[in-house]
Every structure is written in C-alpha cells, then in structure tokens.
Swiss-Prot record:
Alphabetized Gene3D superfamilies for the sequence: 2.40.30.130, 3.10.310.40, 3.30.54.20, 6.10.250.550, Bira Bifunctional Protein, Domain 2, Threonyl-trna Synthetase, Chain A, domain 2
Cofactor binding note: Binds 1 zinc ion per subunit.
Species: Xanthobacter autotrophicus (strain ATCC BAA-1158 / Py2)
HAMAP family in the cross-refs: Ala_tRNA_synth_B (MF_00036_B)
Protein name according to UniProt: Alanine--tRNA ligase
Function: Catalyzes the attachment of alanine to tRNA(Ala) in a two-step reaction: alanine is first activated by ATP to form Ala-AMP and then transferred to the acceptor end of tRNA(Ala). Also edits incorrectly charged Ser-tRNA(Ala) and Gly-tRNA(Ala) via its editing domain.
Length: 884
C-alpha cells in the first residue's frame, strides 16, 4: 500500500465493508454554516446530523473530506512550507456513527484498520485518552491489549472536544505512531511532545454529552462517534517517511515544479517548492468549489494563497507564470478521487494564469518598495504597519506576503498599526463620500460594501468568467433572491463586466448558472469606487445569494466599445498635433455605436484641419501596432509623459495605455492614463470616420466619429448616395461636386428672382399702388394689404416699397405664413411721424391677430400673431386707430 490514492481508497473500502455509507466530500465552502470560512474537518457536513436538526438515510458514514485551514483561528498559512506537516489544503479521513455504535466499536474498528489493513506494528502505536475517561482506558486495554505505558492520560482540553460553548461534546482518544528513539521528541503529554518522534495519525471523538449554559453537562440519549485521520500524515507513516511533503502525491507536484524551474527541490530553496505544491492544491480545489480570487472574504484568502505561491515561484527564478502549468499534474494525481477538479481544470488554469499575470506586474515594484522601506532594519526589527498597509492597498500585497518576504531576515511586521490603517481607510472613505450625490443610497451601498467587499474586475483579461452572487438589491433594499421576471441589482465577488466610468459605457451580457437560472445584464454601474453593480432581468430560475454563475459579456458590443475607446486616444493625440498643445480632453462618450470627444479649442475646425486629424489617426490604425498597458506609480506615469485627463481621480497606481510609434523619435505616439478597455492592436479599430465637429460651450469643441463596422457602413452608405446623385445628374462621380455647386447657385438665382416677382405682385404689379389697396383715413393715405407666399423677413422691404409708392401716408402689410400664422409690419412716412407712431399702430394690429406687443421705431415697427385668418381685421383695426 504505497500510494496516497490507494491509502484513501483502502480507508473508505474498509468502512464500507463494516456497514458504513461512503459519503462524498462536501465543498470547501460550508453550505449551511456561516460561522466557518472553510470546511476544516470531516464532521462539518454532519454538524446538523449530530445536533439532531437533520436526518440522513444512514447511521454510519465514512468520508475523505477536503479541508482548508488558512483563515481565522485555523490558520496554518505562515508555517506552510517550513515544517513537515503544516498544510493549507489537506484531506481528512473519517468514520462517523450517528447514535449507532459507540466507544467499544469505534476503538475496535480503528485498531483493526491500523494494525490489520494498514499493517502498522502494534509496538509502534501509542494512544491517549482524556484523564477522566476510564471507559476508554479500559477498552484500549481490552480490545487492543495495550499495556498501561502505551495508554497516556491527558488532563487538558487537547483530549476533550466541544462544538462550541454549548452543544454536543465529549472526550477524545488519539492514536500516535512512534518513529523510534532515533527521532527527537517525547510522548504525548510530555515536555518534548512537539518533536517528530510521536506523530498523531487519528483522533477519535466520543460525543456523549451535551454542554448546557452555566457549565452543566447532560448525557446524550444517543451518543455518537466522530473521527479524523489526516491522510497526509498517515501516508507519510505508511510510506516510511518523516515528512508529509515526501509522500508520493506531494513529490509528484514538487518534481514538476523542479522540472519547470530547474531548481533542486531538496536544496536551499526546498521551502519554496513545498509552498507551491501545497498552495496549488488549495488554489485548484477552492476554485473548483466556486471561490475566486478577490479582495475580501474567502476570495481574499485564496488570493493570499495564490500570491504567496507565486512569490515563491519568483524566488525560484520563474520568468513566466508557473502555477497554471502545474494544474494538469494535480488533476492527474487527484482527479479520480475528486472529479470536480477535472471539470474545473480549464477554469483553474485560466484563473491562476490571470492572477499570476496580474500579480507579476506589481510584484517587482512592491518588492522594491519593501526593500527600500526595510533598508535600516536588522534581525529582530519591526516593519511599519502603515507601509505594510500601503503595499496591501496599492500593490495588492497581502499582509502575510510582506511577512513572508521579511521572514528570512528575521523582521516582523507591526500588525497593530496595519489594522489601524485599515480601519482608518474605511472611516475616511465614508466621510469623503458624504454629499457625493448618492446620499439616498449611501447607507445601502456602504452596508453592502462592508459585507461583501470590493468587486474584483477581470475584464481586462477576459470577457467570460465564473463568479458567485455576493448580494442582491431590489427597490432599494437588500433581498435574498430575484425570481424569473424580476429586475434587480446583482453584486458578484468578481466580474468581467466593465462598470460605466471614464466616459465608457458599462457592459451588458448574460449570466447563467446552477438550477437553470439565467438573466440578462442590461447595465453595469460602479458604486463607492470599487463595487460593481449589475442591473439584471431574470429570465429563468431564481438568483440567490451564493449562486455560482457563468458570466458572459456581450462580446460584439465590448469589441465595438474597445475600438471606439482606443480611437479616442488616437484622435486626441491627432488633435494636439494639428491644432496645438493647448488641446485637452474635456469629456467623452465611448459607446458601442459611436464615440464623442470634447476638447479645448477656441474656434471651429476648418474642413482641412478635420480631414488632417482623421488622416493622422487612421495612419496609426493602418500600421496595426500593439496597444500596450502598463501598471505604474501615478507620479512616474505623469513624469514619463502620460496624459492625465480632466476630472479623473487617480490612486497611487495607474494603468498607462500606449499605442503607436512616433515617426520623429520612436517614442509612443499616444500615452494616457486610462482605466478603460482597449483593443490589442491599433488595426483592431478597423477605421475611424469623423462625422461632425461642433461647439459644446465657449472654448470647447466636440467631434463625433464612428469606427470599425459602423464606420464602414457609414462610408458605404455615403458612397452609395454619391453614386446615386451622380446617376441623377448624369455626370461622373468626380464631377458631382462641381455640378451640384452649379445647381445650387442656379437655384439661389431663381429664388431671388421669384422673391422679387412676388414682391412686385404683392404691391400691385410694380406700378403705382392699386386703388383697392389704398384707403383714405381722414386726409391720410393708408396702404393696407394682406399677402401670402412672402417670407416674414421680406415684409419690411415691401413696406419701404409701399411708402415710395404713396409718397405720404401709412403702410400696413400682413403676411400670412403657410401654417396660418401672421407677421405684420407698419411704416409711417417721415412727414407724418409727428402724428402717427408705427409702434402703437403695429401693436393694435398684433392684438387683432391674437398676439401681444410689437416693437421698432416710430417710422417702422414689426409684430406678429397666431391667427392669420384675422389679417383683414388687423388692417381694419389699424385704420380705426388712425381715425380715432
């Protein structure tokens, strides 16, 4: 029985033969126990069975339970890699009795397994019992035939187990393997018990009491059994090695690390090989169970594990991402026992690759800062907690990674100051957000943010990922679920969906997952700076908190947005080259169907300038050069020439997007600080077509443009229209512009002639004013006429013409428009201004037309009214006013 897989199978097979149900491992994320970060023992999935809350169709069970201890009080992370038996991920073999057999049968089954099935020498086995458990002491003597010196009484809580302050509890009995006197260490309970000579391989818990508040214990009517055997530990014993990392499974992983790094796994860097092997298992199994790296909760613990391994890969000299290349070996070794990692193999590889790629970009700078800040520290010194927090907050360095990097130098970290900095940041964030325009939902989003943490954005690297529903909101309140047909807001632990910001619209797409749930993502917004909120409409199933989902961004739409966003960068720089360095971005809209770019410039662009801007931008599109993104300190980025845009708030670390190569000096053509999504190469933009240029405000201009397919369709339509025009004109395309210009000028000439003809016709054909249009009011001539087909702006010209015709008098002309409204102009010849005021007369006419007011000079005034049908009445009213 040499292999770990055979040992696991033998354990399960043994208990199945003894009437136990083989129960599959439960997930690493406890399904019904919010008090636990991760499943850390075999009994976790049976907790409700032991307490009587849940019934199972069997009373005996055997499992091989996957476990993680890397957070909370069960945190082995710091020791992993440096000791023989510490792990973040491990397997716990166990057999359980739910009110069926008890101590005697449990001891008999355990003894027979280790001595008969596993064939461990009896004389190398030692057991412990709780000092008050005389029954267990007697049973070991009776069943196993152990002498008194092989049964050790332990008076401490090490041999008394409890589920909590209240609930089931009972004494324990542990089985130890003695490696012999050549190995340092003493027996359990002795001052030297922490040595490697005596290794615990199995713990039997006899649940026989119920702990009541106040300290009283009652005997359980149906006592139960819970046992746990560490597979890694017992495998080391059975394989004759003293170190869990020397078992066949771990050596297979370590050997692959050594192969890929060309570093001796048993040399000075042995610990790094072990860290990677252990953390690989935790990373893959957690990913398979729906945990993905993030900055809060379980995802943060996973990120710490991954990044600690990645840091050790870097110490081994790995130049490229390493962790994802180890996944196939792990799947080969453990996939038969745990088929979930077979199903999740590609997801695990993708997640590890993305995480390591992201981490490597910031690792070098973070380590440089760590080195600078710790230069004056020597062994025994303490690294400032505030600096450790900056490394965490700005560069994604978990605290334990900083501790691990300083460990070799004997330097500790001031964790109290680290915690204080963390608390201070949260308080400042709340204060700075006050009055930001989201007051109505501040409390809600801060509450959600505190509970679920920041959303991890994956969209720079992928458009499809897996995520877990962290919170749901409907009608301004947190809810437990969203049913089919309902709309609401979904917050995920991580997302590939870009949230609207920096002028770029948010992504849309679909999510789907377990239980047949599917929903449309119709918008993605950002709250509090780092909380991504997905507006969804559930189509089928029910979205619940904790639901694992496949997240798919609308690829075509995202591609169009990327093209438009990258085009704004090219256009921005082209505008600076054509118009001058005063050009600065003042706003933008990056949508899938178009782009809009606002910039500072004092006057309209000429046609030549606009064409030159478009030509320059398209020159870099045609070159199809790479678009590069770097993560830099904001000060370094700006010093290097990157353009920081208006109104943007930047952290200590920024994304710098560069594209194109300048013809003059070989430097990047465009370099900007930008958090948006971009094409991989400028050629992916396809084409840039500028549609228009206009004014937005004083000193601010706007250009609108299309890219890619939208630009192509626009140009195709324009080309078709041009060809159609040429056909109508019966002229070659090259002559269309000149022919159209000629036609336009001819039209204008004809329109002028027509207007003159209408004026003459309106005034009686060009001679003296016709008698029927001239009235005599007292001794004053009044030329009053209603006209149609004359633009209102031309009425003054008609009045001037009328004044010439009558020599002395008043002229009143009402022009009726095609929509039934009217304009009225009144003129008074110079000799009569002392008697008649044109303004007063036009107001009388306007009132008759249903209007109010009017204005002008005593000799010429204008007004209007909504009712052109009252034109004659208006003229009569003016005549009456003159007579009055």
């Amino acid at each position: 029985m040499s292999g770990v897989n055979e040992i696991r199978s033998s354990f399960i097979d043994y208990f199945v033969k003894e009437g136990h149900e083989a129960v599959a491992s439960s997930p690493l994320v406890p399904q019904n126990d919010p008090t636990l970060m991760f499943t850390n023992a075999g009994m976790v999935q049976f907790k409700n069975v032991f307490t009587g809350v849940e019934k199972r169709p069997y009373s005996r069970a055997a499992t091989s339970q996957k476990c993680v201890r890397a957070g909370g009080k069960h945190n082995d992370l710091d020791n992993v890699g440096y000791t023989a038996r510490h792990h973040t991920f491990f397997e716990m073999l166990g057999n359980f009795s739910f009110g069926d057999y008890f101590k005697d049968r449990a001891i008999e089954l355990a003894w027979n397994l280790v001595t008969r099935t596993f064939e461990l020498p009896r004389d190398r086995l030692v057991v412990t019992v709780f000092s008050e458990d005389e029954e267990a002491y007697g049973l070991w003597k009776k069943i196993a035939g152990l002498s008194d010196d092989k049964i050790i009484r332990i008076p401490t809580s090490d041999n008394f187990w409890s589920m909590g302050d209240t609930g089931p509890c009972g004494p324990c009995s542990e089985i130890f393997f003695d490696h012999g006197p050549n190995v340092p260490g003493g027996p359990p309970g002795s001052p030297d018990q922490d040595g490697d000579r005596f290794i615990e391989i199995w713990n039997l818990v006899f649940m026989q009491f119920e702990q009541l508040p106040g300290g009283e214990r009652l005997a359980l009517p149906r006592p139960s059994i819970d046992t746990g055997m560490g597979l890694e530990r017992v495998s080391a014993v059975l394989q004759g090695v003293h170190d869990n990392y020397d078992t066949d499974l771990m050596r297979a992983l370590i050997a692959e690390v050594a192969e890929l790094t060309s570093v001796n796994p048993d040399g000075p860097q042995k610990a790094s090989h072990r860290v990677i092997a252990d953390h690989l298992r935790a990373s893959v199994f957690l990913t398979a169970d729906g945990v993905l790296p993030s900055n809060e909760g379980r995802g943060y613990v996973l990120r710490r594990i991954m990044r600690r391994a990645m840091r050790h890969a870097q110490l081994l000299g790995a130049k490229d991402p390493l962790m994802h290349r180890l996944v196939p070996v792990l799947v080969r070794e453990m996939g038969r026992a745990y088929p979930e990692i077979v199903r999740a193999e590609s997801l695990a590889e993708e997640t590890l690759l993305l995480e390591e790629t992201r981490f490597r970009r910031t690792l070098e700078r973070g380590l440089s800062i760590l080195e600078e800040e710790s230069t004056g520290l020597t062994s025994g010194g303490q690294f400032p907690g505030e600096v450790a927090f900056k490394l965490y907050d700005t560069y994604g360095f978990p605290l334990d990674l900083t501790q691990d990097a300083l460990r070799a130098r004997g330097i500790s970290v001031d964790t109290t100051a680290f915690d204080a900095a963390m608390a201070r940041q949260k308080a400042e964030a709340r204060a700075s957000w006050a009055g930001s325009g989201e007051a109505a939902t501040d409390t809600l989003w801060f509450s959600v943010r505190d509970e679920v943490g920041a959303t991890e954005f994956l969209g720079y690297e992928t458009e499809k990922a897996e995520g877990v529903v962290a919170a749901l909101v409907r009608d301004g309140a947190v809810v437990d679920s969203l049913a089919a047909g309902e709309k609401g807001l979904v917050i995920l632990n991580q997302t590939p969906f870009y949230a609207e910001s920096g002028g770029q619209v948010g992504d849309i797409g679909r999510v789907s997952g377990e239980g047949g749930v599917a929903a449309q993502v119709v918008a993605t917004q950002k709250k509090l700076g780092d909380l991504f909120v997905h507006e969804v409409k559930v189509e089928t199933g029910t979205l619940k908190r904790g639901t694992a989902l496949v997240l798919e961004v609308d690829h075509a739409r995202r591609a169009a947005v990327r093209a438009n966003h990258s085009a704004t960068h090219l256009l921005h720089e082209a505008l600076r080259r054509v118009l001058g360095d005063h050009v600065a971005q003042k706003g933008s809209l990056v949508a899938p169907d178009r782009l809009r770019f606002d910039f500072s410039h004092p006057k309209p662009l000429s046609g030549g300038e606009l064409a030159e801007v478009e030509t320059i931008a398209n020159r870099f599109v045609l070159r199809n050069e790479p678009v590069e993104t770097r993560i830099m300190a904001v000060d370094d980025a700006i010093t290097s020439g990157a353009r920081a845009l208006f109104g943007e708030k930047y952290g200590d670390e920024v994304r710098v997007v560069s594209m194109g190569t300048d013809d003059g000096n070989g430097a990047p053509y465009s370099v900007e600080l930008c958090g948006g999504t971009h094409v991989k190469r400028t050629g992916d933009i396809g084409l840039i077509s500028v549609l228009s240029e206009s004014a937005v405000a004083s000193g601010v201009r706007r250009i609108e443009a299309l890219t890619a397919d939208a630009a192509r369709r626009h140009l195709n339509a324009a080309s078709a229209a041009l060809a159609g025009t040429a056909a109508v004109l019966k002229a070659p395309v090259a002559e269309v512009e000149a022919r159209v210009a000629t036609l336009v000028e001819e039209r204008r000439r004809l329109e002028r002639e027509l207007a003159e003809a209408r004026k003459k016709l309106a005034m009686g054909g060009g001679g003296e004013a016709s008698g029927d249009a001239v009235r005599t009011v007292g001794d004053i001539k009044l030329l009053a006429r209603r006209v149609e087909g004359i633009e209102i702006k031309d009425l003054k010209g008609l009045v001037d013409e009328g004044k010439k015709q009558i020599g002395s008098g008043v002229v009143a002309i009402v022009g009726v428009t095609s929509d039934g409204k009217a304009g009225i102009v009144v003129g008074v010849t110079a000799d009569l201004i002392a008697r008649f005021d044109a303004v007063a007369l036009v107001r009388v006419g306007s009132e008759a037309l249903g209007g109010k007011g009017g204005g002008g000079r005593p000799d010429m005034a204008q007004a209007g009214g909504p009712d052109g049908a009252k034109a004659e009445a208006a003229l009569d009213a003016i005549a009456a006013a003159m007579a009055g």
